[in-house]
Amino acid sequence: TTVRLHTGDPCIYGAIREQMDILDEKNIAYDYCPGVSAFCGAASALNLEYTLPDISQSVIITRMEGRTPVPSKESIQSFAAHQATMVVFLSTGMLEELSRRLIEGGYTADTPAAIVYKATWPEQKTFVCTVGTLAKTAAENNITKTALMIIGDTVAADRKSVV
């Protein structure tokens, strides 16, 4: 028996489909065991709920284009127009551009945001900020990768202030 252990849930940015296709082609049996995605762990780390009445009833999970392209119809700007809670994976090194696109799409610079570094790991760190201060917050805390960003009013629903 061989195990391919993946952090989080392999159905979100886990390349699991490509791996299962190869196993299927070779007629190799396998089991797919779900995990807990970092976006769920991040909500727990921040004691927040992604969907709140009168604030947001939708969660958008996306990423900036990197090694893997993102279809143009799934641009950050088009998703930002919905003003729903947004979770952005795999984009920590592009936070200035992420902020620009979020604002271009309709969020304001003072929209609440958070950066969660290594969600659910022992070295987990959380930073509540705004769309306009994402890059500055990451730089001040030496966060360059392995983080996700949460955007939207649910981030500050029960918080007194954001930086």
What is each stretch, according to the model?
Residues 1-2, 15, 58, 66, ...:
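A contiguous loop/helix-start segment that scaffolds small-molecule binding in enzyme catalytic cores
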Residues 7-82, 122-128:
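Class I SAM-dependent methyltransferase SAM-binding "motif I" and its flanking Rossmann-like core
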